[in-house]
């Protein structure tokens, strides 16, 4: 997992600033190690209203400022602690949202898959996007939970015998293995319905217009223009020799990226983001959504079932077209790095400290091992 050292970023920017003052009134630097390629740091040399009269005075003033920066560096971003804290909050909210009640069987089935663990990447992205545009956790937590409920529904249905026929998910037997196909289908249906109820009823301190907009975004992300579209084309493409890169991208943008995109966009809308901010984050999310699937394809052929917590090599067995199958492992990895870079470029112009979680999440998705 990668993290962003904001302290090093700010300190290096400062040193570059000082080095250029004696050479030019205005220069622009693009930091070579900075993942935000399009974020150029412009150092404008402004005339002081009270000019310093000597070179020694300038040096003394700069040394004092540099010493102050070194003594009080901005804290680096701790991605592991961030995900642990967000994960705990999300798990508590999910636990409270769906208590064990009658009818017991359906609630047991819903909770079995929903609370089985998982990386909680989608709800974390929702919360991070909300905070990036000036909101807080409480404004987006119901939406974050709703996204995780819908994601869980998609996994339950995806594992069914009529779909991928899988028996392992998150290191445990799949829902239909434990509760039967009939209850598994109904558990997925119930999670889907309750997700929208939860956003509508539990979202507080957000205007009704923004809540309605968020509901519309989420519905579009998972319907016939989103997740379902990707799943249908994926099923129809099994065993086909006519699946090219364009069709594969369509499958994964819809089947995987659309829900990740929805998570980020919901957070931005509910947090009070402007239309411009929402669209930048939409593009960021689409890139990391496709990135997630490219990495998933790579892991499917390079890791074991034990390492993944789900059945490895199942796409190969089902004769599905994947990025490694079309591009090879190394070219797939290069494509993943390209998507990661392009995603992070969309965060240029946002507060770097607030953008740090989204940068780190993109790096995590790119370099995850399961």
From Swiss-Prot:
<comment type="similarity">
    <text>Belongs to the FPP/GGPP synthase family.</text>
</comment>
<feature type="binding site">
    <location>
        <position position="119"/>
    </location>
    <ligand>
        <name>isopentenyl diphosphate</name>
    </ligand>
</feature>
<keyword id="KW-0150">Chloroplast</keyword>
<dbReference type="InterPro" id="IPR000092">
    <property type="entry name" value="Polyprenyl_synt"/>
</dbReference>
<feature type="binding site">
    <location>
        <position position="164"/>
    </location>
    <ligand>
        <name>Mg(2+) 2</name>
    </ligand>
</feature>
<dbReference type="GO" id="GO:0046872">
    <property type="term" value="F:metal ion binding"/>
</dbReference>
<feature type="binding site">
    <location>
        <position position="169"/>
    </location>
    <ligand>
        <name>dimethylallyl diphosphate</name>
    </ligand>
</feature>
<feature type="binding site">
    <location>
        <position position="255"/>
    </location>
    <ligand>
        <name>dimethylallyl diphosphate</name>
    </ligand>
</feature>
<dbReference type="GO" id="GO:0016117">
    <property type="term" value="P:carotenoid biosynthetic process"/>
</dbReference>
<keyword id="KW-0460">Magnesium</keyword>
<dbReference type="GO" id="GO:0045337">
    <property type="term" value="P:farnesyl diphosphate biosynthetic process"/>
</dbReference>
<dbReference type="GO" id="GO:0004337">
    <property type="term" value="F:(2E,6E)-farnesyl diphosphate synthase activity"/>
</dbReference>
<feature type="binding site">
    <location>
        <position position="122"/>
    </location>
    <ligand>
        <name>isopentenyl diphosphate</name>
    </ligand>
</feature>
<comment type="pathway">
    <text>Isoprenoid biosynthesis; farnesyl diphosphate biosynthesis; farnesyl diphosphate from geranyl diphosphate and isopentenyl diphosphate: step 1/1.</text>
</comment>
<feature type="transit peptide" description="Chloroplast">
    <location>
        <begin position="1"/>
        <end position="42"/>
    </location>
</feature>
<feature type="binding site">
    <location>
        <position position="164"/>
    </location>
    <ligand>
        <name>Mg(2+) 1</name>
    </ligand>
</feature>
<keyword id="KW-0934">Plastid</keyword>
<comment type="subunit">
    <text>Monomer.</text>
</comment>
<protein>
    <recommendedName>
        <fullName>Geranylgeranyl pyrophosphate synthase, chloroplastic</fullName>
        <ecNumber>2.5.1.-</ecNumber>
        <ecNumber>2.5.1.1</ecNumber>
        <ecNumber>2.5.1.29</ecNumber>
        <ecNumber>2.5.1.10</ecNumber>
    </recommendedName>
</protein>
<dbReference type="GO" id="GO:0004161">
    <property type="term" value="F:dimethylallyltranstransferase activity"/>
</dbReference>
<keyword id="KW-0125">Carotenoid biosynthesis</keyword>
<keyword id="KW-0479">Metal-binding</keyword>
<dbReference type="GO" id="GO:0033386">
    <property type="term" value="P:geranylgeranyl diphosphate biosynthetic process"/>
</dbReference>
<feature type="binding site">
    <location>
        <position position="170"/>
    </location>
    <ligand>
        <name>isopentenyl diphosphate</name>
    </ligand>
</feature>
<keyword id="KW-0414">Isoprene biosynthesis</keyword>
<feature type="binding site">
    <location>
        <position position="151"/>
    </location>
    <ligand>
        <name>isopentenyl diphosphate</name>
    </ligand>
</feature>
<dbReference type="InterPro" id="IPR008949">
    <property type="entry name" value="Isoprenoid_synthase_dom_sf"/>
</dbReference>
<dbReference type="InterPro" id="IPR033749">
    <property type="entry name" value="Polyprenyl_synt_CS"/>
</dbReference>
<dbReference type="GO" id="GO:0009507">
    <property type="term" value="C:chloroplast"/>
</dbReference>
<keyword id="KW-0808">Transferase</keyword>
<feature type="binding site">
    <location>
        <position position="293"/>
    </location>
    <ligand>
        <name>dimethylallyl diphosphate</name>
    </ligand>
</feature>
<feature type="binding site">
    <location>
        <position position="158"/>
    </location>
    <ligand>
        <name>Mg(2+) 1</name>
    </ligand>
</feature>
<feature type="binding site">
    <location>
        <position position="158"/>
    </location>
    <ligand>
        <name>Mg(2+) 2</name>
    </ligand>
</feature>
<comment type="function">
    <text>Catalyzes the trans-addition of the three molecules of IPP onto DMAPP to form geranylgeranyl pyrophosphate.</text>
</comment>
<dbReference type="Pfam" id="PF00348">
    <property type="entry name" value="polyprenyl_synt"/>
</dbReference>
<dbReference type="InterPro" id="IPR053378">
    <property type="entry name" value="Prenyl_diphosphate_synthase"/>
</dbReference>
<feature type="binding site">
    <location>
        <position position="256"/>
    </location>
    <ligand>
        <name>dimethylallyl diphosphate</name>
    </ligand>
</feature>
<keyword id="KW-0809">Transit peptide</keyword>
<dbReference type="GO" id="GO:0033384">
    <property type="term" value="P:geranyl diphosphate biosynthetic process"/>
</dbReference>
<feature type="binding site">
    <location>
        <position position="310"/>
    </location>
    <ligand>
        <name>dimethylallyl diphosphate</name>
    </ligand>
</feature>
<comment type="pathway">
    <text>Isoprenoid biosynthesis; geranyl diphosphate biosynthesis; geranyl diphosphate from dimethylallyl diphosphate and isopentenyl diphosphate: step 1/1.</text>
</comment>
<feature type="binding site">
    <location>
        <position position="320"/>
    </location>
    <ligand>
        <name>dimethylallyl diphosphate</name>
    </ligand>
</feature>
